[in-house]
């Protein structure tokens, strides 16, 4: 049975999976303890994780990742739908990704619209971030009205 849970304790147990969504531990540490961590579980097994920070009139999806063997089954979309309700007091849900990422289509299919760039964002990482054979520099931002 699938259920959503807020994860309030022992976040360190989820770091290996979160690192699949954001491969730089230093970057992950910037938001790991200040955001809300949610899991979609199948009984006791985590299927999808998402970490969201909320400031002002926006909630920002800092990390979303589905366990590899469960990818492509709609669990990420279920999580986005859940988060849209959970953070509906905020005006928007924001998400960022690389410029050539397949995640762009994922966000667009889930009602997000292109909203801007964070210039030079990926240059802050301790190593070059390569996606589909290209080095990333800017983060592409998406936004969805939820409130």
Where do the model's predicted regions map?
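Conserved GNAT acetyl-CoA-binding A-motif
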Residues: 86-99
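Short hydrophobic/aromatic beta-strand or adjacent loop that forms the aromatic wall/cage
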Residues: 35, 136-142
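Conserved N-terminal entry element of GNAT/NAT acetyltransferase domains
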Residues: 1-10, 140, 147
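Conserved active-site alpha-helix within GNAT-family acetyltransferase domains
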Residues: 77, 99-131
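Conserved acetyl-CoA pyrophosphate-binding loop and the N-cap/start of the following alpha-helix
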Residues: 70-82
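Acetyl-CoA-dependent GNAT
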Residues: 5-68, 80
